[in-house]
Amino acid sequence: SLSVVLTIVYVAFILYETLMFRESGDARTNFVLFSYAERFLTEQSVRVGVINNIWLFVPLGAGLYRIIQKKWVLLVPFLMSVAIETTQYITGLGIAEFDDVFGNTMGGWIGVLTAWAWLSRKMSVKNRT
């Protein structure tokens, strides 16, 4: 179906964005969750980074909601983000960060909830007519 194709294309886009624009170097990590919290209000670059981590996974969550079993839909964004951060760590591409996993997972969940709300409303309107 179109939902499957679009979701696969979007997964490829995420992988491209998170892995292909990085220079290989020494593996760097930041395993402190919410390490940017103090600087979030004062540094625009930190805000942009956090927001980008969230919005990047919103379409993924929405697509997944339509194509996989509902019991897995909240787990997949988390697992994909962990896989990306692990790849970044192993290859030295970028910085492997817990904050990225958290933001990506939240974005995926926002996408799932948005798709659920939109499709529930659509079905409700359809049933009324």
Predicted features along the sequence, with ranges:
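Bulky hydrophobic segments
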Residues: 1-98, 109-129
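Membrane-interface transmembrane-helix boundary segments in multi-pass integral membrane proteins
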Residues: 105-106
